[in-house]
């Protein structure tokens, strides 16, 4: 608990967000962009965060309700072979579950971003399948 307090105090005094302290400025940007994406998608708004050449299945607004940004990381092609050809630079898992899911239901699980001159844009979304509720 003391460690968290020190991190929070450092973030406050330096003007940085906690996400910037933990994940660095680039990781914090991925988290912030993902929160914007979830907000856009869960309200049914068209998001300006989608790359022109995106292959992402965006699903329905209800698929996004209850989700939030997880942990950002630089893209790892060995783990995400399907997305490697799309040349993303970042991936982030989504945390939480949309309401009313039952085993076998699918939901957005990971978002893949490409860096552009305008900022990050979504190039793909990997959907996860709920195995068990409990």
Predicted regions and their residues:
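N-terminal export and membrane-targeting signals
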Residues: 1-6, 21-25
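C-terminal motif of bacterial Sec signal peptides marking the signal peptidase cleavage site
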Residues: 12-15
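Bacterial signal peptide processing site
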Residues: 17-19
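Short, aromatic-enriched amphipathic alpha-helices that serve as compact interaction elements
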Residues: 23-43
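Short solvent-exposed beta->alpha transition segments
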Residues: 45-89
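Exposed beta-sheet edge and beta->alpha loop/turn motif
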Residues: 79-134
């Amino acid at each position: 608990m003391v460690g968290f307090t020190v991190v929070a105090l450092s973030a406050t005094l330096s003007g940085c967000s906690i996400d910037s302290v933990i994940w660095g400025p680039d990781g914090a940007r991925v988290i912030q962009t993902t929160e914007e994406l979830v907000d856009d998608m869960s309200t049914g708004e068209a998001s300006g965060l989608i790359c022109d050449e995106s292959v992402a299945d965006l699903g329905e607004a209800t698929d996004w309700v209850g989700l939030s940004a997880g942990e950002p990381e630089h893209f790892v092609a060995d783990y995400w072979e399907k997305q490697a050809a799309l040349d993303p630079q970042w991936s982030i898992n989504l945390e939480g579950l949309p309401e009313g899911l039952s085993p076998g239901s699918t939901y957005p699980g990971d978002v893949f971003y490409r860096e552009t001159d305008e900022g990050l844009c979504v190039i793909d979304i990997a959907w996860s399948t709920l195995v068990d509720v409990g």
